[in-house]
Design a protein with these regions (language model features):
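A membrane-topology feature that recognizes alpha-helical transmembrane segments
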Residues: 1-149
């Protein structure tokens, strides 16, 4: 858990500063999650969920860049969601729906905080902290929604 917290901090701070998520950092994060799942009995890895979330968010990435020339979701964010889905999420439409709602709640909170602090609408948003927050909300959701996890 400490290792995951380390990667959450490193990736979030780097994304807040540079608006980029390095592939090398994501590979180290994925490797540590795989190693953790091999040595832990209660960890589950779902490659299908990782591929499913990665595909859905890749389509969103392509649509957002095709419809809005200044960009939308970054591909580093798509890869981060794929890595987190590989380790923590379930596959299925209900899981995608819960993660979407969690991500939108985190993004709205991020934008509102930015508006309150800076008094202007942000041109670009570092989404890594919001993705990690949405993942936490997603993992907490089955308790309230009685979903299998």
């Amino acid at each position: 858990m400490v290792l995951v917290g380390y990667f959450v901090l490193v990736i979030s701070i780097k994304d807040l500063v540079t608006h980029k998520i390095r592939n090398r950092t994501l590979l180290y994060f994925l490797s540590s999650l795989i190693a953790f799942s091999l040595f832990s009995q209660n960890a589950h890895v779902n490659p299908f969920a990782g591929a499913c979330f990665f595909t859905i968010f890749t389509v969103l990435y392509l649509l957002s860049n095709a419809l809005h020339k200044s960009g939308g979701i970054g591909f580093g964010d798509v890869k981060l969601i794929g890595v987190l889905a590989f380790a923590y999420f379930d596959s299925g439409l209900r899981s995608v729906e819960i993660f979407f709602v969690s991500l939108w709640l985190a993004l709205v909170a991020h934008i509102c905080l930015h508006l309150l602090i800076c008094r202007k609408f942000p041109y670009r948003i570092a989404m890594a902290p919001d993705i990690f927050l949405a993942s936490g909300l997603y993992l907490y959701a089955p308790i309230g929604l009685l979903l299998p996890q």
